[in-house]
Every structure is written in structure tokens, then in C-alpha cells.
Amino acid sequence: MSKGIVLLAAGGTGGHVFPAEALAFKLKERGYSVHLVTDSRAERYAGKFPAEEIHVVPSATIGSKNPVAVARSLWTLWSGMRAAKKLIQRLQPVIVVGFGGYPTVPPLLAATRLGVPSMIHEQNAVMGRANKALATRVQAIAGGFLPEGGAAFPDKTVTTGNPVRPAIIAAAEVPYTPSHPGEAFNLVVFGGSQGAQYFSKALPTAISLLDDALRVRLRITQQVRPEDMEMVSGCVARLEMGADIAPFFTDMAERLARAHLVICRSGASTVSEISVIGRPAVLVPYPHALDHDQAANAAALAATGGAKVIAQSELSPEKIAAILTAVMNDPEKLSHMAAAAKLAGKPDAANLLADMVEAIAARRTIAEFKRTRA
């Protein structure tokens, strides 16, 4: 018999859906039924998301200054509120949990108005707009990187970390083994489409600037856009070095486990994964993020000593070559960075988040939860 229904709400992008998915698995293990509220973008995840049912509720973001567009968005939000209220009244969930993105606004507002326990999870080091709008209304805030003491809502914030997928937990069992002079050096480079495009242009040039003794040590895994495959593969072939170049790697967790250095963007999931595994990183925040969330995520890991942060505007091929030269000749420094990253990781985030959900569903206060958490 189910302990009750937990209604999860998440925007339709992977950054919102993946932590919700990790929590859903944990809650189902504990005997709860799980439903998901999202938008049509999440239909691609429907096959593997462990929900009894996935519900699409109307929602919209108010980002335009056009009065007609604003009126249309407000009407959509009002319609979503009505639909979410009916859904909650029908399902009778024990709690509603939001993971950010504008589709979370109607169900979380409806829950607070109906007196249903509610909480949000913020993946980044700074709150997104949807979560910021909901923060004053919910009973609790779980944070991937939000500090408990210095957050905007310290009395109801718990730093749980970001839940990571099982493959990452398995990869975390692999200890970091430094690469000494003369030994192979595994470099993993990846980022979203914008990051992949930038790295595709900068990295081959940077590698061409390395001394031959360093270049022959490199073993590169690089994620590139399909349209850049031919160009990057050609550059790498001319450099006569070992490289795997592809738009997507199904075994990225294993490749991260073998990495001696990672160069990547600093989305919340990425930073969480490399810290759980414990690998040194050069983080290049996406420069056009609305809330500068990637810069804040990167700064959080850099503060522990587990990463070096470089703005994209400063990351020339010459700079990359200088960094590679320095770290490939200093395995001890990379080992210290790996250890620092590992200490910052939160491999038990999904369990802690599930504990928090159960506590809020039982109408316990955050103060009580903090006193009794593991």
C-alpha cells in the first residue's frame, strides 16, 4: 500500500527533470507514489521518469514588455492555476515539490493556497526566477549549492546537494590516480551546445601550442556539435594524438572517472557530478546566463580548491596551453584539487532530499528536521 502521492513539478529541461527523477526513484523505494507536473518539453523523458502519471499544466513566463504578450501570459498562468488546483484536489498529494522552471509556478501556488505542504529544490548557487517567486510561500527550500547560513531564507533552507545519477555514484568509487611526466594524461572536455562550439574552436589550437613531449601524452575525450565533427577530427588527426571526438558519449561517467583534468561549463548538474566523482576541473561559466548561475556554481567549487574558474573572454588558446603545461607538470597539484572536489561532493543528496520531503510532508518544521537529520 502506498504511503501517499508525492507531486513533483519541474520545468521541461534536463537540469530540472534529472534531480526530480533521482528523487522520484528514492521516494518510490520508500513506498510513495509519484506524479509529475511539467510542460510538453519533458515528454522526451516520459519513458524513463518513474511516475505513475505525467501531467501537463498550462504555464507561461512573463518576460515580455509587450502588454498584449503580458496579458496572454497572465491568462495562461491563471488557467494553469485552475488546472493545478483541480489536479491537486483530485490526487490529494501529501506534498508538492518544485524543481524550478516556469511550469512549477501554477502547481506550487495552488498547493500553498490549498494548504498542502510544499517545498522547492534549487539546483544552482543563485535562485532562478520561478523558485525566487515561490520561495516566500513554500515551507522549505532545498539547495544544491545554496548556503544554509547565508541564503536569503536561512530559516527554511537546507543544503542537500544535487541528486546525481547512479552511474556517477558508481564512478565515484574509482580513486583519482595522478598522471606523472611521461605517462598518458586523460583530458575530458565538454559543455552544452554553446560550450561545445567554443571548445571546438579553441582546444585544437591550444594543443598545437604544446611542447611535443606534452602533446603525445594527451588522451582527449571531447564533446563537439555534429556540425563541428569534421573540423575538430581533422585538426586532431593532424596533431597525431589519441582522441575520442563525438557529439554525445553514453559512458561519460566512466570517462570522467578516468580523467586527470576536466574542462567544461559549470551548470549545476555538471559541477555536482565532477565533485561527487572528485576530479580537478577548469570551469568556464556560460557568459550569457540570465542569473549568472553558472558563475556562482563555479565559484562555489573553486572556493573549496577543487576547480579553477576562467571567464570565456579570458580563455584564449594560449591560456589553455599554459594551463595544460602547468598542470601536466604538477600531478601533486591536481591530486590536491581532486581531493578538494571530492570533499565538496554530496553523493547522498537524493537520500537527504527524500528525508526532507518526508519531514515536510509530515508537517515537521525545518528546525526539527535540521536537529534530527543524519
Swiss-Prot record:
Protein name: UDP-N-acetylglucosamine--N-acetylmuramyl-(pentapeptide) pyrophosphoryl-undecaprenol N-acetylglucosamine transferase
Its membrane topology: Peripheral membrane protein
GO biological process, one term: peptidoglycan biosynthetic process
CDD domains assigned to the protein according to its UniProt record, in alphabetical order: GT28_MurG
Amino-acid positions noted as binding UDP-N-acetyl-alpha-D-glucosamine in the UniProt annotation, renumbered to this chain: 13-15, 124, 165, 193, 294
Reported function: Cell wall formation. Catalyzes the transfer of a GlcNAc subunit on undecaprenyl-pyrophosphoryl-MurNAc-pentapeptide (lipid intermediate I) to form undecaprenyl-pyrophosphoryl-MurNAc-(pentapeptide)GlcNAc (lipid intermediate II).
Species this protein is from: Rhizobium johnstonii (strain DSM 114642 / LMG 32736 / 3841) (Rhizobium leguminosarum bv. viciae)
Catalytic reaction(s) noted: di-trans,octa-cis-undecaprenyl diphospho-N-acetyl-alpha-D-muramoyl-L-alanyl-D-glutamyl-meso-2,6-diaminopimeloyl-D-alanyl-D-alanine + UDP-N-acetyl-alpha-D-glucosamine = di-trans,octa-cis-undecaprenyl diphospho-[N-acetyl-alpha-D-glucosaminyl-(1->4)]-N-acetyl-alpha-D-muramoyl-L-alanyl-D-glutamyl-meso-2,6-diaminopimeloyl-D-alanyl-D-alanine + UDP + H(+)
Record's subcellular location: Cell inner membrane
Pathways per UniProt: Cell wall biogenesis; peptidoglycan biosynthesis
